[in-house]
A protein has these predicted regions:
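Non-catalytic, mostly N-terminal accessory regions of nucleic-acid modification and defense proteins
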Residues: 1-220
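Conserved S-adenosyl-L-methionine
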Residues: 198-250
Length: 250
């Protein structure tokens, strides 16, 4: 999965580079957001196929997302009511398959951006960041506006969709996988090699964070209601490692 992750990062980077965004802060935002969208899509499908009411219908279909496209609004709401609170919600028109099949239509960039914003709004209660002023910041924002030439935005959107279409997260849902650290480390290496700089020189690599987490948690297996606080958190790699070591349910 690590090799597949890096391959996908490089694929997305080839797209951002082709549209003049290589080595920019926008590139990191685009790569992480497309990763997260694909993660949401695959996680939703993975859990929906295990739903006690509709799971059999979806899992027996040749393509679960094509079958999901046939759901009525009532069936969609019913499915949502059975899914765990921690699972992202996607409407039929939000799935990657539905979007991918719409790529030949005009103004696809607007459709992709609107879909990402709609998913963020639908999942704002569970998946958002709260600022110190108690304002909520959504997890998805329009992506194609980073391309200044409006005539090229549709092709940019199509290219991003082609990049993520072949990647599958379902193999990692039964284990713990911090893909953000892979993205950050791989992009960071590229930035530093290209510019000769020392970006994020105080960043803690994922392997080191895992060792730190094991040392901090120790052999204590009777932990309950744990809260972790890292005042200097950047990518959250140490917090993720601690959560995995302790157990998210604790």
């Amino acid at each position: 999965i690590s090799e597949a992750t890096i391959a996908l990062i490089d694929s997305l980077k080839s797209t951002t580079g082709a549209f003049g965004l290589a080595g920019t802060g926008s590139e990191y935002k685009i790569v992480t957001e497309m990763f997260l969208y694909k993660f949401f899509n695959d996680k939703f499908g993975y859990e929906a196929k295990r739903d006690p009411m509709h799971g059999e219908r979806l899992s027996k279909a040749e393509k679960w997302d094509a079958e999901y496209d046939t759901f009525t609004e009532e069936e969609v709401e019913d499915l949502f009511s059975y899914l765990p609170h921690s699972v992202p919600r996607l409407k039929p028109e939000h799935t990657l398959s539905h979007l991918y099949n719409s790529a030949t239509k005009g103004d696809f960039s607007t459709l992709l951006d609107a879909t990402l914003v709609d998913i963020a709004s639908l999942n704002a209660e569970t998946f958002s960041v709260t600022t110190s002023g108690k304002s909520k910041v959504n997890i998805f924002f329009p992506l194609t506006t980073y391309v200044t030439d409006t005539q090229k935005r549709d092709e940019f959107a199509k290219s991003l969709m082609r990049n993520v279409a072949s990647f599958n997260f379902e193999d990692v849902f039964d284990e713990k996988y911090d893909f953000f650290s892979h993205i950050f480390e791989h992009l960071l290496k590229g930035f530093n090699n290209a510019g000769g700089g020392k970006y994020a020189e105080y960043y803690t690599p994922r392997a080191i964070a895992q060792v730190m987490a094991r040392l901090l948690v120790g052999e204590n297996t009777d932990l309950r209601g744990v809260t972790c606080y890292d005042p200097s958190a950047g990518t959250g790699t140490l917090l993720m490692a601690l959560a995995h070591q302790i157990g998210e349910e604790r």
